[in-house]
A protein has these predicted regions:
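FabD-like malonyl-/acyl-CoA
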Residues: 1-139, 144, 190, 267-299
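Alpha/beta catalytic cores of group-transfer enzymes, especially the acyltransferase/condensing modules
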Residues: 11-12, 37-42, 98-249
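Non-catalytic positions within long, well-ordered alpha-helices that form the structural scaffold/packing
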Residues: 75, 180, 258-264
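Generic hydrophobic alpha-helical scaffold/packing signal
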Residues: 225, 244, 257-261, 278, ...
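Short, flexible loop segments at boundaries between secondary-structure elements
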Residues: 229, 289-310
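Amphipathic coiled-coil/heptad-repeat helices and related helical stalk/stem segments
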Residues: 252-253
Length: 310
């Protein structure tokens, strides 16, 4: 058995995520509570009475805190992945799992990233749209044609048949209309608070570069596959530059999954919340066994099913 652990990105968050783990696992609590933030992490993540969880400056640290907690539980259970990766924001969680960041560092960096991205998005009439069943080249041509109206790029290569475009709303809407004419089955506008993974996020990249200059990183203990490359990179010194590039560049998740297949991965554990990545795995690597983990019950079920192979 060769296991990879994948970490979810923004969009899967919901109030209450991680609460069962927090109440039942000291290891989860220690990781979750390790960061110093300027808001009440428990209140936003577990209850969210003020509706803050879907704002990126809150979403990001909440998601990473949840993921770091689950990683601590996995380590306690003796789970040792051969590879780790994350979708977008999930890359911070993957780097924590690999030993590059501490849990405290990953959560605090995610909080900083969220604020930087929210600031970069201010004043931009932005949009992101999922495009189904149109190939990369055809969609790229649609974006190129629509770019006369503003910035529009393919920002996520999720899996076969699912791409996401983003940028300035007028250009995104035009590219989506052209995509339908070119044969796309559906174009689904997404609820987002910024034009993520486009060049409009360059100011966020600049802010992150300054922050990373003051950070120290641990040695990579597990190979990480990076969003902007779609493959692993062993050179830990390049991590800051890759994260700066990631925030303003396309996420190659389909390429990442195909690379995991090439590396012999036959089991994948998705650390949620949600199961979006499991859907991508099913479409990209149909022969790979995949389980999604959001609750202790789901984790125990996966580990029990895989016990003999682990």
């Amino acid at each position: 058995m060769k296991l990879a652990v994948l970490y979810a990105g923004q969009g899967a968050q919901h109030p209450g995520m991680g609460k069962e783990f927090y109440e039942g696992s000291p290891a989860f609590r220690a990781a979750f509570d390790s960061a110093e933030l300027d808001f009440d992490l428990h209140r936003v993540c577990f209850e969210d009475p003020d509706g803050l969880l879907n704002q990126t400056e809150y979403t990001q640290p909440c998601m990473v805190a949840f993921a770091c907690g689950v990683t601590a539980v996995l380590a306690q259970q003796g789970v040792k992945p051969a590879y780790v990766a994350g979708l977008s924001l999930g890359e911070y969680s993957a780097l924590e799992a690999a030993g590059v960041f501490t849990a405290k560092q990953a959560i605090e960096l995610a909080a900083y990233s969220g604020k930087a991205m929210a600031e970069a998005a201010k004043g931009i009439d932005c949009g992101m749209t999922a495009v189904l069943n149109l190939d990369r080249q055809a969609l790229a041509a649609c974006c190129e044609q629509a770019a006369q109206l503003g910035c529009v790029q393919i920002c996520n290569y999720n899996c076969p048949g699912q791409l996401v475009i983003g940028g300035e709303k007028a250009a995104v809407d035009k590219a989506a209309a052209l995509a339908k004419e070119a044969g796309a089955r559906r174009c689904i506008p997404l609820k987002v608070s910024g034009p993520f993974h486009t060049r409009l996020m360059a100011p966020a990249g600049d802010a992150l570069a300054k922050r990373f200059a003051s950070e120290s990183f641990g040695e990579m203990q597990v190979p990480v596959l990076f969003n902007c490359l779609g493959r692993e990179k062993a050179d830990a010194d390049s991590i800051p530059a890759l994260l700066v590039k990631q925030v303003q560049s396309s996420v190659y998740m389909e390429d990442t999954l195909r690379r995991l297949g090439e590396l012999g991965v036959d089991h994948i554990l998705e650390v949620g919340p949600g199961s979006a990545l499991a859907g991508f795995v099913k479409k990209t690597l149909p022969g790979v066994v995949c389980a999604s983990v959001e609750t202790p019950e789901q984790l125990n079920a996966a580990l029990t099913a895989w016990k003999e192979e682990l």
